Amino acid sequence: SVLKEIDSVGLWSVESWGCAIFDSCIRYLGEDPWERIRNIKSKMPNTPQQMLLRGQNLLGYKHYSDEIVHKFIEKSKTNGVDVFRIFDALNDPRNMETAIKATIENDGHAQGTISYTTSPVHNLQTWVDLSLKLQDFGCHSLAIKDMAGLLDPYVGFELVSRLKEEINIPIHLHSHATTGMSTTTAIKCVEAGLDNIDTSISSMSMTYGHSATETVVGILDNTDYETKIDLEKLEPIAKHFREVRKKYSNFEGSLKGVDARIITSQVPGGMLTNLENQLKEQNASDKFDEVIDEIPNVRSDLGFIPLVTPTSQIVGTQAVINVLNNERYKVITKETSALLKGEYGKTPSAVDKVLQEKVLNGESPVTCRPADLIDNNEYDKTKEKFLKVIGESKLDIEASEENILIYTLFPEIGMKFLENRDKQE
């Protein structure tokens, strides 16, 4: 199988689980995400399996109790995840600390992550300070998550050079190709001392994705930085995914090359496709450019937050509403309101005071770590609710910790998946 071929390459890790993968399994594929990671792990015994984890948000769009974070990471490690890439959409270290410590306690590799962005309030020292904090938490490595492809080659060189002076854990780079800079940035970062790069196999690379594995390997061959990866081993893998891509061509975004507007709008690749679909469903595809122009304005109002799940969805949806209503903030979404109230954590800079006062309605904003406000018996309460639902519905569903976690993170679609799991074709 293609998994055995990937396993023979000698990669540092393969990102095969977490976030959108878990969601897609139960929402679209009718596939048990826990079984998926067990199967992948069994077929790739030589390659560490990696997942993306949204810190205190885990895989979802809200904060969970420390108890649930510990439980989820424990079960993820047991089922086959080795490397946990942990980030927070606001770069609030308080939202990453529990997940990092839970990973370490379960003998996983904790990779602390900075969600790279640019703004009037972000500079080199911002990233150095956050990286030092993540190292202090005990992280085994650091990832620079450049989800919108904004890190240019020379800033990348400067950033990695400075980080290598300040921290002593390995540094990884995750950069999307949307702006056309990812490959050049990767090479400059390697020259500055970068330890590892995220790439995609050539047939699934570039545009919304990452630089091609083969391209990066080829560039670094016969240099002081060569990867020791055999290009010939990559060809059958590229061939396999070339066919897979044809099968799902109807679901691809419209971007065919580079979209330089992202350098100013800062919209990540995944967010672009979501916006296109959102506007298409509302017969408003012609408003796409207006929405792209509105996004930086909303982001500024919300404290120059990075655009990565879930903040990318919050900003994107609010921008769409502002444009379609032809009036800014006539309607404020529940999620935008929560962010203004401080319920997601500390924003990089102060949010718009007028908007904040409007949603607070005389109350005080949240200034503590949001998870400190959550009842730590959340897991037991969710388990009781789960048992009650399957009991009343007379459903033959095992009350395993994995199933309870599916229900905890995705109550509606999770239960629908569990009800129909044995009926999938």
Task: Map each language-model feature to its residues.
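Terminal or standalone catalytic/regulatory effector modules within metabolic enzymes
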Residues: 5-25, 255-262, 266, 270-425
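Active-site beta->alpha loop and helix N-cap motifs at the rims of alpha/beta catalytic domains
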Residues: 13, 17-135, 139-142, 149-153
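Glycine-rich phosphate-binding active-site loops on the catalytic face of alpha/beta enzymes
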Residues: 86, 146, 192-209
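Conserved, mostly hydrophobic/aromatic
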Residues: 86, 142, 193, 216, ...
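Short gly/pro/ser/thr-enriched loop/turn and capping motifs at secondary-structure boundaries
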Residues: 117-120, 179-180, 203-208
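Catalytic cores of alpha/beta
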Residues: 122-134, 179-195
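Core active-site phosphate/anionic-ligand binding loop and the adjoining beta-turn-alpha structural block
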Residues: 184, 209, 213, 217-220, ...
